[in-house]
Amino acid sequence: MPSDVGFPGNEAGTRCWRVRRADDGGVVAGVEPLGWDPAAVAADEVVIRVEAAGFNYKDALAATGHPGVMRVSPLVPGIDAAGRVVGGGGLASGTAVVVTGNGLGETRDGGFAGFVRVPAAAVIPRPATLSTEAAMACGTAGLTALIACDRLAMLVDGRHARPDEEWLVTGASGGVGMMAVAVLAAAGHRVVACSRKVSAVVTVTSLGAAAVVRPDEIIDPTPKSLVKGRWAGVVDTVGGPLLADVLRAVRPGGAVAAIGMAGGADLLTSVHPFILRGVTLAGIDAAAIPTQAERAALWDRLADLWPRVAAAFPVTRLALDDVGGWAQRMLAGETMGRGIVIPE
């Protein structure tokens, strides 16, 4: 890497959104100069000029100092980033790339900055048909939705699910939920989208939902460990009490892909759905995609999917100065679709 004269990260005006734990146990966060040390860039790292970064629920947690996500201090959040290679890793300067996971925004500085440095093995060439902002509108949310729907297809379709069976997506107004609605509908399933936001009805219907319901409309007040089976497959982005209730209503041989915890991290349930109906509860972790080839294949699928959903998919462009406010709104359940940070 070059000396610090003109070095990416030390350029005048290069900024980031950084969070740190204060001595009194509080959290201090905001926009500040990125200020890299050139010696800190390892030989196997790639430096990327960030053009856009996806805003995920994990980023909202990191931005507010949640210890389960913010593993180091100080930290630049942003588990997704897209931009162009500046140097390193044997990649040509100017190559359009995307990167997700690999500790970004958790154990190492992430994409809410003008530049990011990442392990070369984490970098994926951006599909030519997917713009930088479209890539981040998809991001980890899109990858997670694809993995979840693939897992459900293996578990549920293998038992010859009927075409008229209903598939549920909870938290359908969020990025993962909306993507899951689109993926399941494209596979020919009858999708029921669950959201407490009235404003989401038109959007998720446009993405392929056959029906839109509120959480209270699918919760059965009966204090039983099992209720009438309704769902063949479920993509759950909420967790907590809603996931526990949904499990009781999964049909025999059905499955639930668990993704999020916006509704709570605790799961109070019984073993009855699993041992009496053969229900599978599968955890989904998009950060655990093992190889570059598998990640690249998923990105190619997102590039094919995006043109079919772009017109209906809500995307909000955010400046670095907007990060704190958007994080608070996301944690309060007040956002819809995807936010993308443009760190220019």
What are these regions (language model features)?
Residues 136-215:
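Mid-domain Rossmann-like dinucleotide-binding core that forms the NAD(H)/NADP(H) cofactor-binding site
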Residues 218-229:
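Short amphipathic alpha-helix with an adjacent loop that forms part of the alpha/beta core around
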